[in-house]
Amino acid sequence: MSKKYIIALDQGTTSSRAIVFDHSTNMVASCQREFSQMYPKPGWVEHDAMEIWASQSSTLIEALARADIHSEDVAAIGITNQRETTVIWDKATGKPVYNAIVWQCRRSKAICDELKTQGLEDYVKQATGLLLDPYFSGTKIKWILDNVDGVRERAEKGELLFGTIDTWLVWKLTEGQAHVTDPTNASRTMLFNIHTQEWDETLLKALNIPRSILPEVKPSSAVYGHTRIVGEGSHIAIAGMAGDQQAALFGQLCIEEGMAKNTYGTGCFLLMNTGTEAVQSQHGLLTTIAIGANGEVNYALEGSVFMGGATVQWLRDELGLIRDAQDTEYFASKVEDTHGVYLIPAFVGLGAPYWDPDARGALVGLTRGANRNHIIRAALEAIAYQSRDLLDAMAKDSRVELKQIKVDGGAVANDFLMQFQSDITNVEVQRPDLTETTAMGAAFLAGLAVGFWDSTDELKLKAGVERSFTPQITAQKRDSLYQGWQNAVARTR
């Protein structure tokens, strides 16, 4: 095999990374660069799309240098990205007309409220699988068209293009040759009908968005074009892409119906593959596309918790109870239980399955005997309880009782948390050998598209489990603890 490597570009909310993998899925080299966060008004979040491009393109070049390899050694590049973040740029010059509006940005809430008054809430959920919320790209696009001078007119003349970050990067990498996205990213725009696999004319009309600015939707594993970024004569295929959470699902090889993964980052993202059926949630979850490849689309249920690792950051930065996130395992293990204490980290409201923006955080059950260790333990347990909330909602929606969940993200190194997660959900928790599952998913998609790997069966042989955690408490104890959590949550709403 002359081409021995795959490169994954992992474009996240705070940094851009490039990772070089070999055929055995070993990480050969990596490079990471942070970029600026802009908060022009309360609730507004922006990125400079050109800075994202500069950070991502430079990490690609540096990762190649660190691996001491040349472009001709690389079989393909795969891309995974922060989802929903919105860029509109000039087709001729390649310059954005405005900063990228980030997924966290809430500025388009009034547009969402207007759509609700038009009676479109149920239609949005049925067609796109999403909630009518500023989180998604559609209302961000409308905001730029309506509020930046001259942009709507230029868009209607066909002079401008829209893309989520995957689309923007592919367009730049291919020097404007490819204006494409994949089904996972398209499904997060609130403009894509996940059943017909087409941009939805009803929603485009409701938001007054010209169809001409939207990218072509291609499979998640396919060759979209080639890049010469690493020098004249280079010609690397851009061959796979997926939004970050779907890439992690694929990287964990959750490719069959009923398989699920939980990513523990700042928040928690639990996704469950529901196969070829788009399950409409009745319990506060999103219906989204898991992957679109080989002429088939798989769907997923998705639940997100706002405060996962961020709860531990709060213990460290605001309360000063710990110096390092890793210390939580030591302190939590020094006590038998939380002494009846529950921490509900509803600092910015509650996410799925509650979707209560007005809920606020609370420490419930404090007595004179409660100490620092109990509170630290309660913070870790809160992450697991919230994941149990999501798992229960998924079981009700999918009518599938999960027996196993795969985990990734920074917090999975915490053995106490992983064991308690297994205990409170009564599910086996599997921690993989390789925790870079998001980048790995992008690499897998690209490698499969160009024949670097033959099949997902081959990939399964390379995927190892570093440790499995199995339930160690009684059903009675589990039910009692979870009832206490539910009672505590009720007091925050």
Swiss-Prot record:
Report disulfide bridges, numbered on this chain.
Answer: none
Summarize where glycerol binds, as residue positions. R83, E84, Y135, D244, Q245
Give the residues the record marks as binding ATP. Answer: T13, T14, S15, T266, G309, Q313, G410
Write down the PROSITE patterns for this protein, in alphabetical order.
FGGY_KINASES_1 (PS00933), FGGY_KINASES_2 (PS00445)
Report the superkingdom from the record. Bacteria
UniProt keywords (A-Z) are: ATP-binding, Glycerol metabolism, Kinase, Nucleotide-binding, Transferase
Provide the reaction this enzyme catalyses: glycerol + ATP = sn-glycerol 3-phosphate + ADP + H(+)
Task: Kindly give the Pfam families that the UniProt entry links to this protein.
Answer: FGGY_C (PF02782), FGGY_N (PF00370)
Q: In which pathway does it act?
A: Polyol metabolism; glycerol degradation via glycerol kinase pathway; sn-glycerol 3-phosphate from glycerol: step 1/1
Q: What SUPFAM superfamilies does the record point to?
A: Actin-like ATPase domain
Q: Which Gene Ontology terms cover its molecular function?
A: ATP binding; glycerol kinase activity
E.C. numbers: 2.7.1.30
Q: Which GO terms describe its cellular component?
A: cytosol
| InterPro entries from the UniProt entry | ATPase_NBD (IPR043129), Carb_kinase_FGGY (IPR000577), Carb_kinase_FGGY_CS (IPR018483), FGGY_C (IPR018485), FGGY_N (IPR018484), Glycerol_kin (IPR005999)
Q: Where does sn-glycerol 3-phosphate bind?
A: T13, R83, E84, Y135, D244
* One Gene Ontology term from the biological process aspect of the record: glycerol catabolic process
> How does its activity get regulated?
Inhibited by fructose 1,6-bisphosphate (FBP).
Q: Which residues bind ADP?
A: T13, R17, T266, G309, G410, N414
Q: Which family does it belong to?
A: Belongs to the FGGY kinase family.
Write out the function statement from the record.
Key enzyme in the regulation of glycerol uptake and metabolism. Catalyzes the phosphorylation of glycerol to yield sn-glycerol 3-phosphate.
Q: This chain belongs to which protein, by name?
A: Glycerol kinase
Organism of derivation: Shewanella halifaxensis (strain HAW-EB4)
State which gene encodes it.
Answer: glpK
